[in-house]
């Protein structure tokens, strides 16, 4: 079984019962869960003071336990406050041997992008303690794809995507759209050329999703990729004023501007049903009438 080390660099864990349920679910499955005290920390809306949350991250460089999964408790907001003070060099150096398998999403995207930008460190965009492992019921699709990514040096995700017939190969990167936008022009924005960019978000109206995608487009980031994959955009509900404008309108507009394939429909993001993606790994994307495949390799895995 595996060792989970919890970190809480973002928002306060308001759903304490869900966090405890997640810990219990993992221990019942035979796993060991360390650093559980972070779930109770609070300072204003954050999961502790800046010093405490920063230490969650910087202390990873001193973590010597082998075969360790570092799991973010939740997202929210707070990671952006820490970026300038993270010891990136120490974390990058730590990942050169027996790398920690670092997993999270949402606000945690800022940390993941920083690690990729500062030292090509691969992390996993996937489930977190509260929202996923601590849900009323752990989604079997999510659980399967989590272990699929962490246990296999090469694995393939399949879905029925929407978009043109294509084949693209490159570095898989991305995560939460709003967090990526917040990093443009900073040292923590990865400079990936000819990559496969995967994006998701939550509670953003379709026009806000479009505006953020256009910012990536106008900044030259989208045109420099081989392909774009869009996951779930939970809570992106149009209203009467939109008069038919919706996410499909956004996708159509972007496709009219881009010369690279934009593939939608991947179960990836804030929904209970989500895949786990190693950001920074090598990926091959194929989309045909029969379906879509994403084959991923080159990421760290658990040693069985």
UniProtKB/Swiss-Prot annotation:
It catalyses: N-acetyl-D-glucosaminyl-N-acetylmuramoyl-L-alanyl-meso-2,6-diaminoheptanedioyl-D-alanine + H2O = N-acetyl-D-glucosaminyl-N-acetylmuramoyl-L-alanyl-meso-2,6-diaminoheptanedioate + D-alanine. Keywords: Carboxypeptidase, Cell shape, Cell wall biogenesis/degradation, Cytoplasm, Hydrolase, Peptidoglycan synthesis, Protease, Serine protease. The active site is at 106 (nucleophile), 200 (charge relay system), 270 (charge relay system). GO terms for cellular component: cytoplasm. Pfam families: Peptidase_S66, Peptidase_S66C. It is an enzyme of class 3 (hydrolase). The keyword Cell wall biogenesis/degradation applies. Its main location: cytoplasm. GO terms for molecular function: muramoyltetrapeptide carboxypeptidase activity; serine-type peptidase activity. Pathway: Cell wall biogenesis; peptidoglycan recycling. InterPro entries: Carboxypeptidase_A_C_sf, Class_I_gatase-like, LdcA_N, Peptidase_S66_N, Peptidase_S66C, S66_fam. Releases the terminal D-alanine residue from the cytoplasmic tetrapeptide recycling product L-Ala-gamma-D-Glu-meso-Dap-D-Ala. Can also cleave D-Ala from murein derivatives containing the tetrapeptide, i.e. MurNAc-tetrapeptide, UDP-MurNAc-tetrapeptide, GlcNAc-MurNAc-tetrapeptide, and GlcNAc-anhMurNAc-tetrapeptide. Does not act on murein sacculi or cross-linked muropeptides. The tripeptides produced by the LcdA reaction can then be reused as peptidoglycan building blocks; LcdA is thereby involved in murein recycling. PANTHER family: MURAMOYLTETRAPEPTIDE CARBOXYPEPTIDASE, MUREIN TETRAPEPTIDE CARBOXYPEPTIDASE. This is Murein tetrapeptide carboxypeptidase. It comes from Escherichia coli O157:H7. The lineage of its organism: Bacteria, Pseudomonadati, Pseudomonadota, Gammaproteobacteria, Enterobacterales.
